[in-house]
């Protein structure tokens, strides 16, 4: 079995590096164990701006965390977008930020790309929503015997690949726990993504367990796609992950900081991005079949 896996590894295709850029992720910092429904959302934006002011960087791409900006629909006409557009121009950098866009009793979890001198270029609305986190299944029934005040609005799902365009070209984007699902990263890579961004938020948790799981998932997605992954979390962990899964740089929890590294924009498919789960399923079937056959032969010879 080990020989089969090693042989497959030797012939597996990979991505090819193209341009090298400087990339940064912004971690606003703050306390753990907080709730979005009872928190000051304006303060989250202010902490992102404060982190940038305290840690000036010369960078080509800057990624902000999930729900770094909260505004009312349409976000395209919001004051907050104007602030970020001006910032992108002043810094001469592409900003990938994440908006919580309130629309009545609903909201959208949207990542946007902002080019300097241009403003909003593209948006991606989160597709894979969190049940009981971003929406309540059977809300009409459950609200009869449960307090749903912390999830007062229902998230509206997006559609399409996890991808946003920018002057740097196509950028993959998976929001929060979408990084746990290979098909969301694959959708962006198949549409041309040369780098993966992952705005996320784990400030509602009181310990490091979920941030560690998120970072581990980002490392897996980096290896599968052979792409750099930029994970920006409001309170950590934020990280820049190399295509081989190595963590180039990582923040501490609750820290206000900006992480910066040289990264490659890469093209090409791996088996994971080209075929999805099929190769793993075939290998698993071969290993199980081989094990069953070996067991049968041992019983016959006994």
Question: Where do the protein language model's features map onto the residues?
Answer:
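Enzyme catalytic cores with a strong preference for nitrogen-chemistry domains
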Residues: 1-302
